[in-house]
């Protein structure tokens, strides 16, 4: 809660990362080339509700201040994502490169939130489909079977 999170990119993956992180109280900043009106409706709503900060700008290394707890490289350009990952690793910032699992300090889990519990399911980045299937299987269990006894 309260930690700086930077997401570079504003596509499907970036939106998914932000959607999962929002309930946990991080200070999320999204930077991408798109103008605000070009963003997905969900992102525009988060901006209006001041749940995230948005900067419409091209990536440059000055974007990464060094105060970030997590950075997500989620642009549609693998070279830019690689540059972001290298900068973060030099600065000691945890980074997730959506283009290259080898440049990830962590894998983003699939999350199930139920009442006061959060379940994170992560794989080794080789099979996202398997992780998604397991999450769905758990979510489809009757409520009583999902809770510890």
Residue ranges and their predicted role:
Residues 1-19, 149:
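Glycine-rich adenosine-cofactor-binding loop
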Residues 12-13, 79, 125:
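Residue-level detector of alpha-helix initiation sites
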Residues 16, 24-46:
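NAD(P)-binding Rossmann-fold cofactor-contacting core
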Residues 28, 54, 92-95:
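Hydrophobic beta-strand scaffold residues
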Residues 48-63:
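Glycine-rich, highly charged phosphate/nucleotide-binding loops
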Residues 70-75, 81-107:
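ADP-ribose/adenylate-binding Rossmann-like module
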Residues 108-149:
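Adenosine-phosphate binding glycine-rich loop
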